[in-house]
């Protein structure tokens, strides 16, 4: 049984390679990537042609599987609060998360939520595999940090279900995170003084470092993305992943086009 047929038996998203397989796409283009970023990899959605049909499918999936599964399993009483928390995580995917920021968001809507309830609901959402949490790691101090983590959606289609803005950079980062997880890596967000490295991916005691950006528009962008590794003193591989088709590799840091990287080329 092929990988995509096996996955079609359960509501788990395809990765990019599997999404191409089910669509019989041999030579993917940027348009295929954007379609995946926007609508995600849920197997059933590839049988739908119209954007309105795909959005309705994702909305129904969100209501019937995500919300109802969590509500039933954990006996959640405040369903509307749970929904708003999930929507907040969807709209802020790939951003640093803090309890105060989501509390301010909820208060702006006239909602009260204790820290205990908030963290319980967050844990329920993570346990449901709707989102995954990436802790921060202090590269200089060599220790994991317990606050200001990031959350990534298991499927990017949910991020664009209710949002009016399509943040390509955030979705690319989300897809790279999911791909690293699917490849068996433990993934953390790297912290060096006042800067950040998107991902430290560890497997079998070996590390790889990743910066993810949409495009390397100018010298400032190139300097920022490649300069993120300056504080890293080890010799493990370092990658900058973007949608560019020109190779900007420099100083031992490897630049990869995201489609090539996702296809493991």
Language-model features and meaning:
Residues 190, 214-258:
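Catalytic cores of nucleic-acid endonucleases
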Residues 6-9, 250-264:
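Active-site regions of enzymes building and remodeling cell-envelope glycoconjugates
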Residues 19, 37-40, 125, 155, ...:
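Conserved RecA-like P-loop NTPase ATPase core
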Residues 1-9, 23-24:
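Short regulatory helix/loop adjacent to the ATP-binding pocket of P-loop NTPases
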Residues 51-206:
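Accessory nucleic acid-recognition modules appended to NTPase machines
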Residues 24, 28-63:
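Amphipathic alpha-helical "lid/sensor" segments that cap RecA-like P-loop NTPase cores
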Residues 206-208, 237:
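Structural motif
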Residues 11-29:
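Conserved small helical "lid"/interfacial subdomain of P-loop NTPases
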